[in-house]
């Protein structure tokens, strides 16, 4: 029987990422053979990972990485927020973003086949991480955007890495691109422009806005406050030339009824039309980057601000950890039973 020294245990831990006791047991079982011990731990890790495969991993981190003209944002999930702060987990997230930015895969399958600096594939790295960290660790998704040599990439993470954003801006500089990414992190746009919104989606969101106004009006009526008007439109996509012409005509009729002299109408109408556009593009303001009020200059929309500095937003991607993942809501009894079963099976 080979002597299992502290030096051997340390070496195996460094190679495998296993805990002290797991490393020592593996060396004992393989009579001190380092290669066999590594393989044994890998096999045990795969078995442990398989047992954890049906668990829901909704915590985690995003990772962002810029490689030349390419930027990547990734989401990696763990089961608990505690593990998401683990140094090994953070290193895995950052390495994932880097290898994806460099490899430019077309989909998750291609991403998982990429080779990490350690020599293992991304898929193998996640199996091993699940085994060594003790929770289900899963690679969920990624996005890539590319720029030309004349454009600028902005990469930004917020809330300790729970939100990750990448963006491309034409004109301006890298600092402007980062500011745009900061805006995206805070304001949660889902698309660049109203032209990307589905017509039915706009109608549904407008109905929700009017329902909220209806509820508000019920409260206002109880305290004798005037009712708020319902919205006829929610997006620029609904504002045809005929709608704009009719709005201008209504404003002119209003000014005439108020007795305002026609010679000053040209000074009043633009402001009222701006108000009309603001009131009738609420869906755009919620979901489209260009229509949102810019957090760095709240006197302008993002589009207006970028125009003022001869710049233009080209593309972006925003990930927030756990969005769209349905967490299991187990009762206390079920949770205890599941924990005991897991302990017996490990």
Curated annotation (Swiss-Prot):
Task: State the encoding gene.
Answer: tsf
| Classification via HAMAP family | EF_Ts
Q: Which Gene3D superfamilies match?
A: 1.10.286.20, DNA helicase RuvA subunit, C-terminal domain, Elongation factor Ts, dimerisation domain
Family membership, please give it.
Belongs to the EF-Ts family.
UniProt keyword terms in alphabetical order: Cytoplasm, Elongation factor, Protein biosynthesis
Q: Which residues form a coiled coil?
A: none
Among the GO molecular function terms of this UniProt record, one is:
translation elongation factor activity
What's its job?
A: Associates with the EF-Tu.GDP complex and induces the exchange of GDP to GTP. It remains bound to the aminoacyl-tRNA.EF-Tu.GTP complex up to the GTP hydrolysis stage on the ribosome.
Pfam families attached to this UniProt entry: EF_TS
What organism is the protein native to? Streptococcus pyogenes serotype M18 (strain MGAS8232)
Name where it's found.
Cytoplasm
An example of a Gene Ontology cellular component annotation for this protein is: cytoplasm
Q: What is its main location?
A: cytoplasm
Give the protein name, as stated in the record. Answer: Elongation factor Ts
User: Which residues does the annotated region (Involved in Mg(2+) ion dislocation from EF-Tu) include?
Assistant: 80-83
